A protein has these predicted regions:
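Cell-envelope and extracellular/periplasmic
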Residues: 1-240
């Protein structure tokens, strides 16, 4: 990527028309709370697979991954191993960053079983590239949707893998979209809510702002009795 002649874009209607809505609302909220400018470096491609956001060495270190399939020339470029990493991440590595936001997963429900280790390895790689071993990594759990060409449980198992990754990746955080998904539209319209939830998470965990509800209800256990399931949640002091 050639950055010559490029400059930071000021937040204005003409600049944000093509900006990620989630990223915009995230930055807007953080700016308002901290009263400081927030810059966004947006490296994204709709529908990309996680394999495309890491290099081959990283992906090859993960058990259960088919490297040959991931590098296949039959794949779309944004699905192919290393493509997004080489073209959209590596070129911006010299920008100082405060943290990463990640909103992806829908294109990987077919291999949910290795998603948690793939995301863990990817985050480790990115932190090594930025020479920041504890850089915050906040991500969005995929929304409920009737995904085509998949088993009914695949998306739920991918969400479960995202929760598992939360337990493995240090200094990470996840926001849920379970209440704002759309069965028939893979792009839920309430991007402002997603951005606000990510901002609240960052304000709490990175900027140490107290008193914000930064985490949604999290199931901790289930007990079964007389044909009923009794579910216990954390982070639900105000109820579900």
């Amino acid at each position: 990527i050639d950055f010559e002649g490029r400059k930071w874009e000021v937040s204005a209607p003409e600049a944000v028309m093509t900006c990620s809505a989630v990223a915009y609302f995230f930055a807007k909220q953080v700016t308002e709370v901290l009263d400081i400018p927030v810059g966004l470096v947006i490296s994204s491609w709709g529908g990309s697979r996680i394999e495309s956001w890491m290099n081959e060495k990283t992906l090859a270190s993960i058990d259960g991954v088919d490297i040959e399939a991931a590098r296949s020339s039959k794949l779309k470029m944004h699905h192919r191993l290393g493509c997004m990493y080489d073209t959209m991440l590596w070129p911006v590595r010299n920008f100082t960053a405060r943290g990463f936001l990640w909103y992806q997963g829908e294109s990987n429900i077919f291999n949910y079983y290795c998603y948690a280790p793939m995301m863990t390895a990817m985050v480790q790689l990115w932190r090594e590239v930025w020479e920041a071993p504890n850089m915050p990594f906040y991500y969005v759990q995929i929304a409920p949707h009737k995904y085509k060409d998949s088993q009914d449980t695949d998306a739920a198992l991918l969400r479960e893998a995202q929760i598992k990754a939360l337990e493995i990746i240090p200094n990470s955080g996840m926001v849920s979209t379970a209440d704002i998904g759309d069965e028939f539209c893979i792009h839920p319209p309430q991007k402002d809510v997603v951005g606000l939830r990510l901002a609240t998470l960052a304000l709490t965990k990175t900027y140490n702002i107290c008193g914000l509800p930064s985490t949604g209800p999290t199931m901790t256990k289930v007990n079964y009795s007389e044909g009923k399931a009794i579910v216990t949640f954390d982070n639900a002091s105000a109820g579900l």
